[in-house]
Structures are given as C-alpha cells and as structure tokens.
Amino acid sequence: MDDFKQAILLLVVDFVFVIILLLVLTFVVPRLQQSSTINTGLRTV
C-alpha cells in the first residue's frame, strides 16, 4: 500500500506541476506578446 500511495502522490504532484506550468504560460505569454509589440512599435518609431 505504501508504494501505491507513493505512486498516487507522484501522479498528483506531476498533475499539479503541469497545471501550474499551464497557468504561468497563460499569464506570461500575453505579457510577452504585449511587450514584443511595444518593442517593435518603438523600433518603427
């Protein structure tokens, strides 16, 4: 049972890690796109 619990814990930890990564990506990517568009706008000007 201990091995079983450890396996479940590993699965849960991986699952949470992936969710956090996805959340961070969804928050960071739009900001990066905004900053990149601002940078290109400054370069053209």
Swiss-Prot record:
Q: Where are the transmembrane segments?
A: 8-28
- Domain of life here? Viruses
* Topology in the lipid bilayer: Single-pass type III membrane protein
What main location does UniProt list?
host cell
- What keywords would UniProt list here? Host endoplasmic reticulum, Host membrane, Membrane, Transmembrane, Transmembrane helix
Q: Where in the cell is it found?
A: Host rough endoplasmic reticulum membrane
Q: Which GO terms describe its cellular component?
A: host cell rough endoplasmic reticulum membrane; membrane
Q: What does this protein do?
A: Transports viral genome to neighboring plant cells directly through plasmosdesmata, without any budding. The movement protein allows efficient cell to cell propagation, by bypassing the host cell wall barrier. Two movement proteins, p6, Hsp70h and three structural proteins, CP, CPm, and P64 are essential for cell-cell movement. Also plays a role in virion formation. Together with CPm and p64, encapsidates the 5'-terminal portion of the viral genome.
Any idea what this protein is called?
Answer: Movement protein p5
List the taxonomic lineage: Viruses, Riboviria, Orthornavirae, Kitrinoviricota, Alsuviricetes
